[in-house]
């Protein structure tokens, strides 16, 4: 078979630079053809054929509607919808419903682009670049998205959670400027580590970070919806969660966040000495045993006292026993249990979004948008290491310095 390699043919072939436009044009032609075939099947005849004199089928073509733009994930195309008259019911294409201006895939893409830290003016620019200058988008489309997120959030916030086998909880609050309030509102957030190794967003509710009552309300609500007692809760020492935990889940063990503690201690050290102090401090939570962590703590405090930094030495002592709780859990899980990074990492995306949160007049609107952001981030949450050990932890296995303590097989004689 010979190929036509004439200059005219070669010039008409798409290049890498024009490939997307070539593909869009092909899709546009194909979809226009499908629209025509829909009408042919409905009327039982081709565009140029006359109606049969024997039992003619009702209905006839009546030109085309106005050109319609349809946003696809690879750009925007223009289609002409055939019009049909003389039918008892209005003809509506299954391929292109009357008011549909974008595909379902683009509908899914819109909230993700909007939520990934784009201000509204940049959001519009980004979509124009992706979907083409003719993309049919409007402020009303974004408003409908926000309303849909609010409705989704309300359903999600009342869902049963009894099917979740929760082992660990990470808790924290993020402050956002929302509404007309003078003070920033906090979004109290709970992320759960499950027996299968997944991490999931469990609760996102507005409230005060240090409020025992606010955290108690969250825990009571989760308990009423089926949450069982977690084995360990990780959070900042200043949170009201600890008083709430004593009220609702007193059996749960507590781990204070090392990131917050190190920052608090360094605040008591002059800037010119912080580099050396940080080097000594960061070694403490990475000690292989609790005993070594205790020694490194004493070494740091001795370093502080030589430099008359009593406040820093004392700050490290605060709530010390709850800084070491993670040693009573599998060593494979320590990476996850030392800090609240599990919450703070996805909030890095949230903070991009909340730089513009002051335009939200209501805290509820900010809550819904941030919740949606976290739910998107949840898809890429890192799974817990050694998930096979989570069932042991859930069943009450004891660990010392990260190693499981075997139950005594023989009873000691009385």
Cite the ranges covered by each PLM segment.
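Acidic/histidine-rich catalytic cores and adjacent linkers
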Residues: 1-10, 14, 37-40, 45, ...
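Short, conserved DNA-binding cores of transcription-related domains
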Residues: 2-97, 177
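Mobile genetic element proteins and their domesticated derivatives, centered on retroelements
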Residues: 35, 39, 74, 86, ...
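RNase H-like nuclease fold core
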Residues: 76-88, 92-101, 105, 131-234, ...
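Metal-dependent DNA phosphodiester-chemistry modules and their immediately adjacent helices/loops
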Residues: 79, 90, 265-301
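Short, amphipathic alpha-helical "recognition" segments used to contact nucleic acids or chromatin
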Residues: 105-117
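DNA-recognition alpha helix
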Residues: 121-133
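Conserved beta-strand -> loop -> alpha-helix junction used to position metal-binding or nucleic-acid-contacting
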Residues: 232-239, 244-280
